[in-house]
Structure formats: C-alpha cells, structure tokens
Amino acid sequence: MIYAAFRSIGAYIPPKIMSNADFEKIIDTSDEWITKRTGIKERRIANEGEASSDLGARAGELAIERAAISKEEIDLVICATVTPDFLCMPSTACLIAAKLGLSNVMAFDVSAACTGFVYALNVAKAFIESGMKKNVLIVGAEKYSAILDYTDRTTCFLFGDGAGAAIISATNDKSESIIDINCSSDGNYEDLIKTPGGGSKNPCSQEVLENKMACIKMKGNETFKLAVKTLTSDVKTMLEKHNLTNEDINHFIPHQANYRIIKAVGEALDLSDEKTVVTVDKYGNTSAASIPMAMNYAFEQGKIKAGDTILFDAFGGGLTWGSALFKFAPIKR
C-alpha cells in the first residue's frame, strides 16, 4: 500500500514591510482600529516586478532543500494561487517549475482561494496514493498587493504577499502518512469574496478598470460569521471521524485571515493558545500561502518536530473550505 507523507516545509517572506501606520497615511483608519478588528499589525509586500511565481520558486527551493531530495526526483508541481502571473496562461506552476530548473515535469494550478493549499495537498495525496507520482512539490503563492484597491478601507489592509511550499512523497509506512483531508465548496455564496471583473463574465474594459472591478471585494461581517461556523464544524467532523480529541493534536494551523476568527474557532474547539499557530499579526492574510507560511514559521521557531500530529483548517472565496490531518514526517537520513 502506498501512502503520502508530508516531508518538508518552506516559505518565502518578502522583506518589505507595510505597517498599520503606513495605512493611516492613505486611508481613514488607525493602527488601533485595524489591530482590534483583525489582529494584523503588519504585512509583507513583494517588490515591483516580482510575481507570484518568483515568490513560489523561492519557497519551493527551500522546501526541496529541506526534504533532502534532488530536483530530478520531483515529478509534479502544483501551485495554489488566485493571483497568477498571467490571467489565463501559462499556469504559475509551469513558471515555478521552470525557475527551479525542472524540465518535463507535470505542472498545473489550483484555484480555491484561501483554501487552495489544502486543495493542492489533497490532489498531491491522490496522485501519490494512486502510484502515478512519487514526489510532489505543492506551493501556495500570492501577490495580493497586485489586486488590492488601496482606497478601499474595508479590504486593503487585510492582505499581504508571500509564499509557502511543501514536498509530499510516497511512503510504505502508514504511521508517518497524511491521515485524511476534506475539501468542500458552496458556490451559492460567491458574492461574499470575489474579484468581479477581468474574467469571462466581466472582461477587461474601461468600466472594469474605472470601477476597480479587478480588485478583490469582500462582505466582511457575513464572511466572518460563516467562517467561524464552518471552520469549527469541519474540524469537529474530522476529529470525530478518526476518534480523536483536541489532546491528540500537537499543532493547529488555521488559515490566517483574522485573529478574531482564529480565536473564536480555537475557543469553540477548546484548543489551547499554545497549540494554535498564529502569524496573521506578522503577515496579514496571504490566502493560499497563509497555512504553509504559518507552518514554516512554527517549524523555524523549533515548535514543529518529526512525528507531530498537525491539523490544517481553511476557508475562502468560492466558498471553499477544507481541513487536513497528518503526521509531519521528514525523511530520516
């Protein structure tokens, strides 16, 4: 029997910091208001000319290095993003593969907004367990600064740029494998989080540009309530399915959208603050990159170790949501 194992984690954090004080200069807001509402203190911004593939390639490079495998051993690249380098083609995954020097490798994108990394992990798991692939590089990469309206005080301060990546590999040892992944969606809530212009429904036009329809729009209050309810239910279902309790989880890594959401879900699940990884204060909401960036942060802080049981939980536009339960299983060399 072939299983999928989570072998390594890596991230790229752009060096440029945009603080709440910077937003005080461009919109009617304050550091106190942003911090109280979201828990965000600062976020990272990619350099001009940098694209999601540049961020993703840097994160991927680190993940490959930590997995202690050669680039030639990678046979699939999946990139989760909603800020691709190009609107239609080529895929960001293809560009990441090229920048990593990978040739003749299968590569494609996954679009599931903030749940994208969990979706990509699920696809990687399926490819490996089917025997079709042995080593998969999954990347969550976002340059949200490219799709923000910096006059919109309801959204512009929420998001940041960055990338995270992981190597998922085949193993015969069930004890070190990915235990389970759940991915769901409900398109009836499409209006809660969306970029209304630029696609085939509302193609690029003078109207789209003038009304900034190619920028992200979000109904914050409705999204908040639904996120807390959905994330809590999803985790409870996952734990009950495997006869686990919160005591069996070493690290809870939720999507980093808003500290109040993270806190509310943690309290509903009775998960201690010590087990919950929080980076939203440092990076803001980096969508598909937020979970791997948060895991990488905890790993570099020495908190995540081989054999730890980790639980991902994410919620995003679509709507999409999902959870993943797995053992962290770096290759022993």
UniProtKB/Swiss-Prot annotation:
Disulfide bonds: none annotated. It holds the Pfam family ACP_syn_III. Keywords: Acyltransferase, Cytoplasm, Fatty acid biosynthesis, Fatty acid metabolism, Lipid biosynthesis, Lipid metabolism, Multifunctional enzyme, Transferase. The active site is at C114, H255, N285. One of its GO terms (cellular component) is cytoplasm. Pathway: Lipid metabolism; fatty acid biosynthesis. It catalyses: malonyl-[ACP] + acetyl-CoA + H(+) = 3-oxobutanoyl-[ACP] + CO2 + CoA. Residues 256-260 are annotated as: ACP-binding. One of its GO terms (molecular function) is beta-ketoacyl-acyl-carrier-protein synthase III activity. GO terms for biological process: fatty acid biosynthetic process; secondary metabolite biosynthetic process. Its main location: cytoplasm. It is an enzyme of class 2 (transferase). Homodimer. Belongs to the thiolase-like superfamily. FabH family. The last Arg residue of the ACP-binding site is essential for the weak association between ACP/AcpP and FabH. Catalyzes the condensation reaction of fatty acid synthesis by the addition to an acyl acceptor of two carbons from malonyl-ACP. Catalyzes the first condensation reaction which initiates fatty acid synthesis and may therefore play a role in governing the total rate of fatty acid production. Possesses both acetoacetyl-ACP synthase and acetyl transacylase activities. Its substrate specificity determines the biosynthesis of branched-chain and/or straight-chain of fatty acids. This is Beta-ketoacyl-[acyl-carrier-protein] synthase III. It comes from Aliarcobacter butzleri (strain RM4018) (Arcobacter butzleri). The gene is fabH.
